[in-house]
């Protein structure tokens, strides 16, 4: 059963208020190539006003970069989409008390799901984080090989991301059996979070 739903990539107060009505958490993207990225100042404003956990999402790789972003935004939750060293992640947790979701990239198509899962499990084991996200790539809007994710989900309570939509999230949940799901472009219309799509997505997740 899915216990955690995150709707990521809010850019405005209107989007934040909409997402808050449905999701358990949201996210704001900074210092990234994503089309949903916002300035740190905007991120700080959204974080201050958020009534649900809001993750600071980025591809930043170093402790100084993350420390600066956390200090400027007041973030209590961060989502790391890079190969940041485990010791640097632990230092962020220790010095800033942030809750960390670490993203791990799953191949779009795997020639050997068991081998790819084993490689990722070994990598995941090096990190001490609060949530594990399996994704295709930050904000890629593309699905990955669920055969790999399903193996990992038997070992860890994972959050599943990557190309999820109201039409395919039910199948994804049945296949992978994740503890949580993370969606962004799948609930947008013309680049903006859409209430109808969010409601359709949530109906499948909660009742499917």
Swiss-Prot record:
Quick one: which pathway? Amino-acid biosynthesis; L-tryptophan biosynthesis; L-tryptophan from chorismate: step 3/5
Q: Which InterPro entries match?
A: Aldolase_TIM, PRAI_dom, RibuloseP-bd_barrel, TrpF_fam
Claim: Amino-acid biosynthesis is one of the keywords in the record: yes
UniProt keyword terms in alphabetical order: Amino-acid biosynthesis, Aromatic amino acid biosynthesis, Isomerase, Tryptophan biosynthesis
GO terms for biological process? L-tryptophan biosynthetic process
Q: Which SUPFAM superfamilies does the record associate with it?
A: Ribulose-phoshate binding barrel (SSF51366)
Output the CDD domains linked to this UniProt entry.
PRAI
Q: Which GO terms describe its molecular function?
A: phosphoribosylanthranilate isomerase activity
* Known EC number: 5.3.1.24
Main enzyme class: isomerase
* Top-rank taxon: Archaea
User: Which reaction is recorded as catalysed by this protein?
Assistant: N-(5-phospho-beta-D-ribosyl)anthranilate = 1-(2-carboxyphenylamino)-1-deoxy-D-ribulose 5-phosphate
Which Pfam families would you find in this protein's record? PRAI
NCBIfam families reported for this sequence:
PRK01222.2-4
- Into which family does the record put it? Belongs to the TrpF family.
Q: What is this protein called?
A: N-(5'-phosphoribosyl)anthranilate isomerase
Tell me the organism's taxonomic lineage. Answer: Archaea, Methanobacteriati, Methanobacteriota, Thermococci, Thermococcales
